[in-house]
Each structure stands twice: as C-alpha cells, then as structure tokens.
Amino acid sequence: MTTLTPLRSVTVNNTYPYTIAIGPGLLHDPLRLAATIRGRHALILSDSEVAPRYAAQLQETLLRARPDLHLNVFTLPAGETSKSLENFSAAIAQLATLGATRDACLFALGGGVIGDLAGFTAACWMRGIDYVQVPTTLLAMVDSSVGGKTAVDIPQGKNMVGAFHPPRAVIADTDTLATLPLRELRAGLSEVIKYGAIRDPVFFHWLQTTREALLARDPAALAQAIARSCEHKADIVGRDPLEKGERVLLNLGHTFGHAIETAQGYSTPGSNNLNHGEAVAVGMVLAARLSNALSLAPAQDTETLKNLLDAYGLPTVLPSGLTPEMLLERMRLDKKNIAGRLRLVLWRGIGHAEAVSDVDEATVRQILANSTNQHTTYSPHQHATTKPPNRRPH
C-alpha cells in the first residue's frame, strides 16, 4: 500500500549528473520512468526473488507511457553468485537478441547484485548505454545504486572486474521495502550506520534513538534514513566520482567484509554465509578495533559502534570457520592496496574516518585472531526466516 510519505530527491552533481528519487509509488509513475528512455529498446534485468513481485508492474508502467517500446525481461537466480562473468555474458546476449542500439536503456530491478551486474553490462554494451537503477532493497537504495560503481565477482575476489558507469537515474520506490525480509532490512541498515560512523555524529545519534521505528519499517523513518544516506554519498561521489580521494572513506569495514564474503563463499538465499551488509558490520567493528590498536580512535567509541550494530541485530564478530590467514590472503588482493601493502579505511571515532596506507599485517592478524576467539550467537537462518510485515505489494 502506498503511504503518504512525500517524495524526496537527491542530486549527484558530477560530469554526468543524475537524480535519486525516493518515495512510495514510483513504480506506478509512467512519466518519471519513461523519461529515462531515449530510444526504442529497453531490457529489465531482475532476479528470481524480485521479478515475480515487481517486474510485471515495471513493464506495465513503461509500456503505458511508451507503447512503441521493445521491452524484454531477463531474470537471474537470486544471490551473490549470480554476479558472475557467465551471467554478464548472458545479459549481453539478451541485449543482442533484443537488437539494442546505443540509445537503449537497461533497468536494474533488484538489489545490489542486480544493480552491479546491470551497470557493468550497460557500461560494456556498445561502449556504454543508459541504465536506470530501480533498487528494491534498503542496501541498494542507500549504497550500491548510487555512484556508478559496477562490477562482477570472480573466484579470487569480489568486484574484481568492473567499471565506473553512472546511472541515468535512481528510482527508489520505498513501497518495495514492505516485502523485504528482515535479514535484508538489517543488512541495509548496516550501510546506513556506516554513514553516521564516518561523517555524521548527529545522524549516528539519530540512529541510536530511532532503532525501533526503522526495524518496524516506519515509512517516515525509513525515508529519512535513505535520504540522509544518499545525501552523504552524493556529496562525496559528486567530488570524487572515480575514487581517487575521499570516496575511499565509504569503504569503512569493506576490506574485512569483502574478505569474509569471499572466504565463506558468497551468500545465497537461505544460506548461513554472511551477506554483504552483515559482513560489513563485522568489518566495521574489526576496523574500529584495529584503529584502537593503532591509537587512532578511542575504545569507548568502538564499543558504542559495536553496541549499535548489536542493537540492530547485526553480527559483530567473525563467523566460525575463518582463520586470520584465510582473510589476510584475500585482503592482500584488495583494490585499495598500494605497492602490495595493505591500505584500509580506519576509524577516528564517531563521525570521522581516514585511509591509512602500509598497515602492519601483524597487527591486523592479531585483531582477526582476537575476533575468531570470541563467541557469537548471531544466527543468519533466524533472520532469513523472519517474515516482513503482512502487507501486500502494490
């Protein structure tokens, strides 16, 4: 059901500016959606969880405004394992079959996996076509849909093959969050917390006091969290679109997090492996503890961050089965490293972060060892089976 929450808009100002529209009912807005299409060909890329709920609605809305449109839908299995070179090739084949020309448009309907794969496909087809991010998860709305990072995974690491290719628009229909599993909602809130942790103490405090409303999917609280997160990312991406400087700060927790995801094997629906948001939550605590060890941040702030993540039901210690060397092996392949030395985003306390080069591996190994020795009661399966509110998708 569409709420009365007002539409919010955030603009990313760089070489190719675009607008992030945030609000309910946007999948029913033919003028907004059709305005993103310059040609006569479009492809909707989605997954097996999202397509049955929303692909037909997006099709109907687009064709209502553009009955001349040649429009196909391509659906992939849900889960991180779909973000592969094989599925990239399959998506390219779909564009070829469609007869897509350089003025075609690709719609990424789903979460971060679909957005990343669709963006990379759009970046490569005929050296670049338009694509529109239509995120249906909180994590995609606040993070992966904004900024133009596109990629696929390979066995050696996450997001190792990709390109910078900004979307033509981001259209975030918040009504889709009504059907989002609680585990995925929490994963998105991990990235929301990150924005407060790296640059906004006021927002961090707001998240401490608004937990119940956010977990209950209060429309006004969610809209505020999404808009504020997007404002932070748009501000940084507008100045540093290619991650040559401050944009790297958005990776707090990600070096550890990506290593966890790769070492465990990427998460699929129903699996025990941590998903991206969960891995980043653990990664933020590890980065904060490393910062404590290097005398960069007060231990009290680290406990405050850990307690906030705990309060949102997110994991904060390494899952069982991972060793420090397993993780370090993957961290050495991280894209942020320079001259073969670890480069991590570390914490300076609530609202502050910085990139630190030449981080001592022995200290990192000790932080990882300390975390593996801690007991965790976090249960991904419990969150995976928690049902969202009993609301019918519009």
From Swiss-Prot:
Transmembrane segments: none annotated. Its EC number is 4.2.3.4. NAD(+) binds at residues 112-116, 136-137, 149, 158, 176-179. The gene is aroB. Residues 371-388 have a biased composition (Polar residues). InterPro entries: Dehydroquinate_synthase, DHQ_synth_AroB, DHQ_synth_fam, DHQS/DOIS_N, DHQS_C. Binds 1 divalent metal cation per subunit. Can use either Co(2+) or Zn(2+). Keywords: Amino-acid biosynthesis, Aromatic amino acid biosynthesis, Cobalt, Cytoplasm, Lyase, Metal-binding, NAD, Nucleotide-binding, Zinc. This is 3-dehydroquinate synthase. It catalyses: 7-phospho-2-dehydro-3-deoxy-D-arabino-heptonate = 3-dehydroquinate + phosphate. One of its GO terms (cellular component) is cytoplasm. Disulfide bonds: none annotated. Pathway: Metabolic intermediate biosynthesis; chorismate biosynthesis; chorismate from D-erythrose 4-phosphate and phosphoenolpyruvate: step 2/7. It is found in: Cytoplasm. Catalyzes the conversion of 3-deoxy-D-arabino-heptulosonate 7-phosphate (DAHP) to dehydroquinate (DHQ). Its cofactor is NAD(+); Co(2+); Zn(2+). The keyword Metal-binding applies. The keyword rRNA processing does not apply. GO terms for molecular function: 3-dehydroquinate synthase activity; metal ion binding; nucleotide binding.
